[in-house]
């Protein structure tokens, strides 16, 4: 029997590249924008405010908005503009209210900000907005991914003009010449399932935690940050594993113009840090002596005032975004660094937009309550020499 002949399929002519891109773009646009504008939940704020008003919430609308989301309406709109394209172009299924209306970009951003600002459970945040727990989870993570990518320009090492301004302000405010910032660390505490609870993550206070290191300017803006490392390591080791350390050691930053002091000494650029850090040519720690001289005491007082800038910044960060100050319940350790980074970006955005924090927002106590500084013995001669010059300079 002769083999059956198969019919030839008509081959479609391939679309040229330009037409294919245009077709895909149009398809995305159609899928992303609802046909019925009334199906979008645009009056979310009025509904939310009515649902969540209480004696502890300010009666003034603008103050109430900032109370819930840590940002003014103007700053909130700017944040929405950063992530709008991402939130529209990749809408997951199920992003609807209990009433059945689609979530607007503004409401998605509000849900994410409220989750980060309050640190409340996804169930509680969902109830406050009239959405389910899974919606809060999806919305928050999509917002984090989008802002992490779109707000990078709010956290980068300053250019030379800005560095000169920072150095001038630190000297004017605290008397330390050529100082570029203050460095410090804080712990993000979490619980871990038994299978993940290794000693690496168990810190000196027997908590499971992740480190966050920040370098701050005089306005308490992050100039640099690193996170993701276990709280069980020492601060000096965290520093050496950080990109900031490599940049400084390779003279890619903190290598600007030195300043000549009245006694003729040349002072290079540096940051100040506490006793947990090593004394390096570009990282100046306080004098540690059982019998300090008057000049050492005077230097340490100035040094502590600069270092307190970083401590206050962490108080504001953890007070504004309380998800960082509460004990996190079994977080995904791969995602946690992104959550921390986005909170740092939001911290800078609020400052960059000229916004302000309400008085009750910063933590009332220390940002790392219960953690004592562990002394680092490492001392480099050039660092010791620079500290000596600064100490002598403050006596004049």
Swiss-Prot record:
<feature type="short sequence motif" description="Nuclear localization signal">
    <location>
        <begin position="6"/>
        <end position="13"/>
    </location>
</feature>
<dbReference type="GO" id="GO:0046872">
    <property type="term" value="F:metal ion binding"/>
</dbReference>
<keyword id="KW-0804">Transcription</keyword>
<comment type="subunit">
    <text>Interacts with core components of POLYCOMB REPRESSIVE COMPLEX 2 (PRC2), a PcG protein complex with H3K27me3 histone methyltransferase activity. Associates with plant-specific PRC2 accessory components such as MSI1, EMF2, VRN2, FIE and CLF.</text>
</comment>
<feature type="region of interest" description="Disordered">
    <location>
        <begin position="1"/>
        <end position="29"/>
    </location>
</feature>
<dbReference type="InterPro" id="IPR027806">
    <property type="entry name" value="HARBI1_dom"/>
</dbReference>
<feature type="domain" description="DDE Tnp4">
    <location>
        <begin position="183"/>
        <end position="348"/>
    </location>
</feature>
<dbReference type="GO" id="GO:0035098">
    <property type="term" value="C:ESC/E(Z) complex"/>
</dbReference>
<comment type="function">
    <text>Transposase-derived protein that may have nuclease activity. Antagonist of polycomb-group (PcG) protein-mediated chromatin silencing, probably by preventing the association of POLYCOMB REPRESSIVE COMPLEX 2 (PRC2) with its accessory components. Needed for full reactivation of several floral homeotic genes that are repressed by PcG.</text>
</comment>
<keyword id="KW-0805">Transcription regulation</keyword>
<feature type="compositionally biased region" description="Basic residues">
    <location>
        <begin position="20"/>
        <end position="29"/>
    </location>
</feature>
<dbReference type="GO" id="GO:0005634">
    <property type="term" value="C:nucleus"/>
</dbReference>
<dbReference type="GO" id="GO:0040029">
    <property type="term" value="P:epigenetic regulation of gene expression"/>
</dbReference>
<keyword id="KW-0479">Metal-binding</keyword>
<comment type="similarity">
    <text>Belongs to the HARBI1 family.</text>
</comment>
<keyword id="KW-0540">Nuclease</keyword>
<keyword id="KW-0378">Hydrolase</keyword>
<feature type="compositionally biased region" description="Basic residues">
    <location>
        <begin position="1"/>
        <end position="12"/>
    </location>
</feature>
<dbReference type="Pfam" id="PF13359">
    <property type="entry name" value="DDE_Tnp_4"/>
</dbReference>
<keyword id="KW-0539">Nucleus</keyword>
<dbReference type="GO" id="GO:0035102">
    <property type="term" value="C:PRC1 complex"/>
</dbReference>
<protein>
    <recommendedName>
        <fullName>Protein ANTAGONIST OF LIKE HETEROCHROMATIN PROTEIN 1</fullName>
        <ecNumber>3.1.-.-</ecNumber>
    </recommendedName>
</protein>
<dbReference type="InterPro" id="IPR045249">
    <property type="entry name" value="HARBI1-like"/>
</dbReference>
<dbReference type="GO" id="GO:0003682">
    <property type="term" value="F:chromatin binding"/>
</dbReference>
<dbReference type="GO" id="GO:0004518">
    <property type="term" value="F:nuclease activity"/>
</dbReference>
């Amino acid at each position: 029997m002769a083999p059956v002949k198969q019919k030839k399929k008509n081959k479609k002519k391939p679309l040229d590249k330009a037409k294919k891109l245009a077709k895909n773009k149009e398809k995305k646009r159609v899928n992303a924008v609802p046909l019925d504008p009334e199906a979008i939940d645009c009056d979310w704020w009025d509904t939310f405010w009515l649902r969540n008003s209480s004696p502890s919430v300010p009666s003034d609308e603008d103050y109430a908005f900032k109370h819930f989301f840590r940002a003014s309406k103007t700053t909130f709109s700017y944040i929405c503009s950063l992530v709008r394209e991402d939130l529209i172009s990749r809408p997951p299924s199920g992003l609807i209210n209990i009433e059945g209306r689609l979530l607007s970009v503004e409401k998605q951003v509000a849900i994410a900000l409220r989750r980060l600002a309050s640190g409340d459970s996804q169930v509680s945040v969902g109830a406050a907005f009239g959405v389910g727990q899974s919606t809060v989870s999806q919305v928050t993570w999509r917002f984090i991914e989008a802002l992490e990518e779109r707000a990078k320009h709010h956290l980068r090492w300053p250019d030379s003009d800005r560095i000169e301004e920072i150095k001038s302000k630190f000297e004017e405010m605290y008397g330390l010449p050529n100082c570029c910032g203050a460095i410090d660390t804080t712990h993000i505490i979490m619980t871990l399932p038994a299978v993940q609870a290794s000693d690496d993550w168990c810190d000196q206070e027997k908590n499971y935690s992740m480190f966050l290191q920040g370098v701050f300017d005089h306005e308490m803006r992050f100039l640099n940050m690193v996170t993701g490392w276990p709280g069980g390591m020492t601060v000096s080791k965290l520093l050496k594993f950080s990109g900031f350390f490599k940049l400084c050691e390779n003279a890619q930053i903190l290598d600007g113009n030195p300043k000549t002091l009245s006694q003729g000494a040349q002072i290079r650029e540096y940051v100040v840090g506490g006793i947990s850090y090593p004394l390096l040519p570009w990282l100046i720690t306080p004098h540690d002596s059982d019998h300090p001289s008057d000049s050492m005491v005077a230097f340490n007082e100035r040094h502590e005032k600069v270092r307190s800038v970083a401590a206050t910044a962490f108080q504001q960060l953890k007070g504004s975004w309380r998800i960082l100050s509460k004990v996190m319940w079994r977080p995904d350790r791969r995602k946690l660094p992104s959550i921390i980074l986005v909170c740092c970006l939001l911290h800078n955005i609020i400052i960059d937009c000229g916004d302000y924090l309400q008085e009750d927002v910063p933590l009332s106590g220390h940002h790392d309550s219960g953690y004592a500084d562990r002394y680092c013995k490492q001392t480099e001669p050039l660092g010791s020499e620079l500290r000596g010059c600064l100490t002598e300079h403050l006596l004049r």
